[in-house]
Structure formats: C-alpha cells, structure tokens
Amino acid sequence: MEILEEKPKEGKIKIKAETLDDLWHLYHIISEGDVVYAKTLRKQAQRSDSLRPEKVEAVPVFLGIKAEKINLHRFANQLRITGPIIYASREDVPLGRYHTLTVEPGTVITIQKEKWKNYHIERLKEAIESSKKARVMIVAIEDGEAEIAIVREYGLDFVGSITYNISGKRYNIKRDDEEKKFFHEVAKSMEELMKRENIEKAIVAGPGFYKENFVNFLRENYPELAKKVVTDDTSMGGRTGIYEVIKRGTVDKVYTESRISKEIKLVEKVIEEIAKNGLVAYGLKEVEEATNYGAVETLIVLDSLLKGELREKIEELMELARNLRASVVVVSSEHEGGDKLKALGGIAALLRFKIK
C-alpha cells in the first residue's frame, strides 16, 4: 500500500492499493459513513438523436460515495463499497443515486473520515510496512498430493490443490515417470504463483523423505526455484501439514515474525492464563472493567467486532487502553487463533495485575 497524499484538515488520505492484503486492510479501515472517492465507470443513458432510442453506455466519472456497505471478495481480488453518490465530476450524474466502487490492486482511492482514530492510522502504517516484507508460500506434499497456501496478513490463503494418481510399487519405472509428472505440475504451479504474487520464499513440508525427493527434483530441473525453497518436517501433508508449519514457527525463521503467527501465539497465551487463573480477562464486561482499572497490558480484539453493532464501544475501549499505555492487537477472524478468541467473546486482555 502507498499513501499518495494527506489532507488532515479535510480528513482525507489518498491511497493506492497494491495487493490483496491491502484490500483486507482497507476493509477494516473504511467504516460506514466514510466518504470514498475514486475513478469509476457508471452506466448513463446517451441520446444519439431524436429519432433513435436512448442507449446505455458506461462512462468514466470521478465519484464520491458515502459508504453504507463494505464487502471484501477475496476470490475476485476486489473490495466493493456501496452507497449514495454525494459528489460527481459530471453534471449528468444524479446525486443521491446508489453506486458501487470496485477497488482492486492498482486502484487509487481517497478516504475521508470525520475523525481518523489511532486504530485506523496504525492499520495504515501496518499495511505499508507489511508491503515491504517478503511473502511466503507453503507447499505440503505427500505421495501424489500437494496443497499450496500463501501466508497473507489475514491468515492462510489456500490457492491450490494438486492430486496425481501415482500407482505401482516404489522404484517401479512407471511410478517414477508418474511421480516426475506430478513434481513438474507442482513446480510449475509454484513458479506461476510466486511470479504473480511476488513471493520470495517457499516452505516445502511433509512427512518422511518425499519432500526431499521433490526438492532434489527441483534442484535438477528448476534450479532457480530450488534456491527459494526451504524444507520442514511435518507429520502429515495437506492442510493439516500447512497448519503444522505455522504452529512450528517455520515461517518466522524465513522472515520476521508473521502477523498470523504472532496473533495465534497471543491467543494461546490468553488460554494458558485462563487455565491457571492467571493475569487475564476475557469477555467485554471483564475486559472493560480491567481497562478502567488501568490493569491491561495487552488488549486483544477480534476484527469482526469492529464491523458489528459494538464497533463504537470497542473503538472507545481501544482508545482508552492506548491512553493508559496498553498495547492493542486486532486479531484476524480468518485463522484458528481468531476462532478461539471468538469463543471467548471476541475480546480478551493480558493484565499487569489482578483486579479480583
């Protein structure tokens, strides 16, 4: 993500989205009531002459819409913002009509808020910093099956699954040929994804020697790809193997601690403290009380709470926690750490001292 222009007095920040992760960050930055400006296409009736009926054409226009619905469509690589038009660069575009702005990687938008809160500014900074980090791919491979995932800011993005029917006994010529075809297919998928997604490292994981055979194959046939690969031992292949890689902290060894790993560890720490009746509070009532006492060391909030009915209350609590020198972490609902936090009410806090 790139910030192109800031107008603090008007509450405007002009941004260029560059990746799917950026769209995810924008989904959490843009709130209902914000005004979003962007170039777009809008269907307009065009009268060619008095004898012919009107024809509808998509004309380019710069619009400002007041956001009412914000939806992230990950598989389409799009963020869609719907609301009434409050500004149009063309006089023939009626104000008040509804329009949907589609934001994709490469789109430039301007966001206008009545007040930019610390949470939103921190999120912007985080998006900019994360765009500088290398992306990581995980490939879990086991006897004719490969699962491919990209480690994104919000969690794991499972982007491919390859299954090949490899028959016969080991060291059989037919089996070896089938295995090579499978390895070629996995390698080509990896190359294509790494180029498209600008991925610099891949972790190849799996049980036994199968992954080593695959990496040796890469060294012989795809030497440039092999240079970007590290291996990890897991008990299983498939998605289970990929989750195992995350839990083992292998991604963190490839580059600085990933967001998903940090969030999962933090939620696990909360659960550990609950189990021993330690320095922890969970659920809105308990966390609010702990914050008011100044007892919160780290406030942990599920991102979906910031899109629901409690948004304003949660944002106020986050601001209060920051003012009392607590750190605030927003956890993605897209991974298992988010699922566990949701079961605790979507909000928890690690404490400096007990309040009860």
Curated annotation (Swiss-Prot):
GO (cellular component) term, any one: cytoplasm
Q: Which GO terms describe its molecular function?
A: endonuclease activity; metal ion binding
Query: Cross-referenced Pfam families, in alphabetical order?
Result: eRF1_1, eRF1_2, eRF1_3
Chief localisation class: cytoplasm
Some GO term, biological process aspect, for this entry: which one?
Answer: nuclear-transcribed mRNA catabolic process, no-go decay
Keywords from the named record: Cytoplasm, Endonuclease, Hydrolase, Metal-binding, Nuclease
Query: By its UniProt entry, which SUPFAM superfamilies does this protein fall under?
Result: Dom34/Pelota N-terminal domain-like, L30e-like, Translational machinery components
Q: Tell me which EC number(s) this protein carries.
A: 3.1.-.-
Cofactor (UniProt): a divalent metal cation
- The source's superkingdom equals Archaea
Instruction: Name where it's found.
Output: Cytoplasm
Similarity comment: family membership: Belongs to the eukaryotic release factor 1 family. Pelota subfamily.
Subunit-level organization: Monomer.
Q: What is known of its domains?
A: The N-terminal domain has the RNA-binding Sm fold. It harbors the endoribonuclease activity.
Primary role: May function in recognizing stalled ribosomes, interact with stem-loop structures in stalled mRNA molecules, and effect endonucleolytic cleavage of the mRNA. May play a role in the release non-functional ribosomes and degradation of damaged mRNAs. Has endoribonuclease activity.
Full protein name: Protein pelota homolog
